[in-house]
Amino acid sequence: GLLYRRWVKQRAADVDRLSGGRLGYVHISSMDDPSFRSVYADILGKYNDREGIVIDTRFNGGGRLHEDIEILFSGKKYFTQVVRGREACDMPSRRWNKPSIMVTCEANYSNAHGTPWVYQHQGIGKVVGMPVPGTMTSVSWETLQDPTLYFGIPIVGYRLPDGSYLENKQLEPDVKIANSPEKIIKGEDEQLETAVKELLKEIDSKK
């Protein structure tokens, strides 16, 4: 809706302002195909020349994107395409080859627990925000005779190499920070501000 679009637009403007135009911002509203296409278009389109990307997963109710996000943001530059002495693009050109950081909150659910877990576990980047409850399972949606009543029945677990399951394993962010009500009503987003600072610090340390 309009309120959501305004919220995303404000966050993108904040990241642009706080980073001096160095970072881009994307929000993954749901772990589904339309959300992935939107993120893909933004990071390889209007943010292609940015030094890093802030990936916001807050308030995401889940779906199935953990593999797609892992592949998209784990690109490693192996060469640059040059046309008559002018750089055209880095390769791979269909993946993000530069630094990124992910923002989470307590309202993340299901695959919005699994996706940040994979992102952190694979060492793609830091996770900033609040812990995410261990809700990574896949469900079968069952509708009753009254079609307004339906339930998601957990049927798929995600087993780790040690034999345990990801479900009930709370994800702890690398940088834990809450958005206080006092700051929220002023329009300030401490989690986003922290993510920008952390990512810029990482980028500058590699120069």
Task: Place the predicted regions along the sequence by residue.
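Cleft-lining beta-strand/loop regions that shape enzyme active-site pockets
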Residues: G1-D146, K183-Q191, K197-S205
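Metal-dependent DNA phosphodiester-chemistry modules and their immediately adjacent helices/loops
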Residues: N108-S110, Q145-I177
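Short secondary-structure boundary motifs at beta->alpha junctions and helix caps
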Residues: K176-I184
